[in-house]
């Protein structure tokens, strides 16, 4: 078997990626989230496939088909809640994965990092179109509000919005195409994840010290397969607790009301994992400015490799930058909270200050802290 795993064309690829892969000996639990994201993706594709067998993408029957899945299909309620909460789990792992990349300077592997940003955009798009499918109140109005943001693009605004809608409002054509997008995008994400891994394995993994570890690498199996398996067990325990005890904790009660174009819900807000971006969008009174800020809140990550001023890669030995990093985390939690609040004082000003601080930390304060730390260390 040992010979076959190294000689067989197909087994050889798996061997180089997951068995004999040279890995730094000191990578911590924060490196588990890549494999956990892979698990989440597989889980979402499988549960989604079973849901698609019973779902109908028609405005008249979409809501009742979801009800049918929960009531009449064997374990349909479980599959539906696993899929809905699996998205939340996916984004928790995704944000921790990105946070680890920022903390330990993994963004200096620019190809891997940029494909990661593309994966983030695609995952957000998939989650958005998926949220529209149950055709509840928040589904319908969320789709209306977010697709309307495209009307800020000069000259082609009306044509573009109507093209996305497939008519003059969010209706049957919109739901059908969103279902098609929601079905195909995870497979594109899976293909891009392979490319993400391909580029990562060209350079090898980073480590908490941020220094080359070529002289002391260990094989991925059994060390990190075992470690990843521990992460998988812990994640599944958290996931099953959420699904079986608090399935609706992260959802919106308004989505249990069928979509009604004549009745606007009092507060239209996206799922919790988009609230930080939604808060940044709302913090700017101008529509076009808000959309630019929304896109830049993610695209700003692509600038990190070019704003790295420190002579050290990781934040492990840089207390100033560490402080800024944790302020950034607190700021994002604050933005998430603000995104779920109504647009009224004092939430408006808190959201604006938090949005400014977000961009200020990433674009100005972190690079400045890197330069100051270089001076302090006499480098």
From Swiss-Prot:
The UniProt entry, under SUPFAM superfamilies, shows: a domain/subunit of cytochrome bc1 complex (Ubiquinol-cytochrome c reductase) (SSF81648), Transmembrane di-heme cytochromes (SSF81342)
Keyword line:
Electron transport, Heme, Iron, Membrane, Metal-binding, Mitochondrion, Mitochondrion inner membrane, Respiratory chain, Transmembrane, Transmembrane helix, Transport, Ubiquinone
Binding of heme b b566 occurs at: 97, 196
What cofactor requirement does the entry state?
A: heme b
Which Gene3D superfamilies would you find in this protein's record?
Cytochrome Bc1 Complex, Chain C
Q: Name one GO molecular function term.
A: ubiquinol-cytochrome-c reductase activity
Q: How is the cofactor bound?
A: Binds 2 heme b groups non-covalently.
Q: Which residues form a coiled coil?
A: none
- Where does the chain bind a ubiquinone? 201
Q: How does it sit in the membrane?
A: Multi-pass membrane protein
Q: Which cell locations does it reside in?
A: Mitochondrion inner membrane
Residues bound to heme b b562: 83, 182
User: What this chain does, per the record?
Assistant: Component of the ubiquinol-cytochrome c reductase complex (complex III or cytochrome b-c1 complex) that is part of the mitochondrial respiratory chain. The b-c1 complex mediates electron transfer from ubiquinol to cytochrome c. Contributes to the generation of a proton gradient across the mitochondrial membrane that is then used for ATP synthesis.
Subunit field text: The cytochrome bc1 complex contains 11 subunits: 3 respiratory subunits (MT-CYB, CYC1 and UQCRFS1), 2 core proteins (UQCRC1 and UQCRC2) and 6 low-molecular weight proteins (UQCRH/QCR6, UQCRB/QCR7, UQCRQ/QCR8, UQCR10/QCR9, UQCR11/QCR10 and a cleavage product of UQCRFS1). This cytochrome bc1 complex then forms a dimer.
Output this protein's name.
Cytochrome b
Task: Quote the gene name from the UniProt entry.
Answer: MT-CYB
């Amino acid at each position: 078997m040992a010979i076959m795993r190294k000689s067989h064309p197909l087994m050889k690829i798996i061997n180089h990626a997951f068995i004999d892969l040279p890995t730094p000996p000191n990578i911590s639990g924060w490196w588990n989230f890549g494999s956990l994201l892979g698990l989440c993706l597989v889980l979402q594709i499988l549960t989604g496939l079973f849901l698609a067998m019973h779902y109908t993408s028609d405005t008249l029957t979409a809501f009742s088909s979801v009800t049918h899945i929960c009531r009449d299909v064997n374990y349909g309620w479980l599959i539906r809640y696993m899929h809905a909460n699996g998205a939340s789990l996916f984004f928790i792992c995704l944000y921790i994965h990105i946070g680890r990349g920022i903390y330990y300077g993994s963004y200096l592997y620019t190809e891997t990092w940029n494909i990661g940003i593309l994966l983030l955009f695609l995952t957000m798009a998939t989650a958005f179109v998926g949220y529209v499918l149950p055709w509840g109140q928040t589904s319908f109005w969320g789709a209306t509000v977010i697709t309307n943001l495209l009307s800020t693009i000069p000259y082609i605004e009306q044509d573009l919005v109507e093209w996305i809608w497939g008519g003059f409002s969010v209706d049957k054509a919109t739901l059908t195409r969103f279902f098609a997008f929601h079905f195909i995008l995870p497979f594109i994400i899976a293909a891009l994840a392979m490319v993400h891994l391909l580029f990562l394995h060209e350079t090898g993994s980073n480590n908490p010290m941020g220094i080359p570890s070529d002289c002391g690498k260990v094989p991925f199996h059994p060390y990190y397969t075992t470690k990843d398996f521990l992460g998988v067990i812990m994640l599944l325990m958290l996931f099953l607790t959420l699904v079986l005890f608090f399935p609706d904790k992260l959802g919106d009660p308004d989505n249990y009301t069928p979509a009604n174009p004549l009745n606007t819900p009092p507060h239209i807000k996206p799922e919790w994992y988009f609230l930080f971006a939604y808060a940044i969008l709302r913090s700017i009174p101008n529509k076009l400015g808000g959309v630019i800020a929304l896109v830049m809140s993610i695209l700003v990550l692509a600038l990190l490799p070019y704003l790295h001023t420190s002579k050290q890669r990781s934040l492990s030995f840089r207390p100033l930058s560490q402080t800024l990093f944790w302020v950034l985390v607190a700021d994002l939690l604050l933005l998430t909270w603000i995104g779920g609040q109504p647009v009224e004082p004092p939430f408006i000003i808190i959201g604006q200050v938090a949005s400014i601080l977000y961009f200020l930390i990433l674009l100005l304060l972190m690079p400045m802290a890197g330069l100051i730390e270089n001076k302090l260390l006499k480098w």
